[in-house]
Swiss-Prot record:
Name of the molecule in the record: Photosystem I assembly protein Ycf4
Biological role: Seems to be required for the assembly of the photosystem I complex.
Domain of life assignment: Eukaryota
Primary location class: plastid
GN (gene name): ycf4
Annotated source species: Cuscuta obtusiflora (Peruvian dodder)
Pfam family, one: Ycf4
One cellular component term from this protein's GO annotations in UniProt: photosystem I
Amino acid sequence: MSWRSEQIWIELIPGSRRESNFLWAFILFFGSLEFILVGTASYLRQNLIAFFPQGMVMTFYGISGLFISLYLLSMLFWNVGGGYHQFDKTRGVICIFRWVFPGRNRRLLLRFFMKDIRSIRIEVKEGFYTRRVLYMDIRGQKGIPLTRTDEVLTPVEIEKKAAELASFLCVPIEVL
C-alpha cells in the first residue's frame, strides 16, 4: 500500500504480519498442544500410546512446537519488519523506518539525502529459486533493499515499481 502526491511518496511495508504467518503460527500452536496432550495422557497411563519412548518424544516435540509458535506469535504482535519508506522532495530527504525486536533500539530509522542517491538497482537471480530485489544505491554505502527478499514479483511488476520510483527521484535504473 502506498500514498503518493507531487512532492511526497509514502510506501507502507507490512513486515511479519502476513496471512501465511498467522496461519502457520496458529497451526503450530494447536498442533503442539495436541502433542503435549497425547504425551501427558501417555504419562498418566491412558492407553493411547506407550510413554517410553513415544510419549516422551511427543511431549518434547509439543514443547518445542509451543516455543516456536510463541516466537511466531510474538513477531506478529510486535510487527517485526513492518514500517514505511518516505520519499520527500520538499525537504530532499528519504526516511526508511522499520520496527525490530523489542529492546533499546526497537525503532530503526535511516535517513538519506536525495542528492546522495546514485541509482535504483534491480537485482535478478535466476535459477530454481528466482529472486528479484529492488535496491536503492547510495554513495558511500551498500545498496538498501526496498522490497522483501521473499516477495515474489514478476519482471513486469518490479520494472514498473523501479520505473515509478526512479522517475519520482530523478535517478537512473540499473539492472544486474
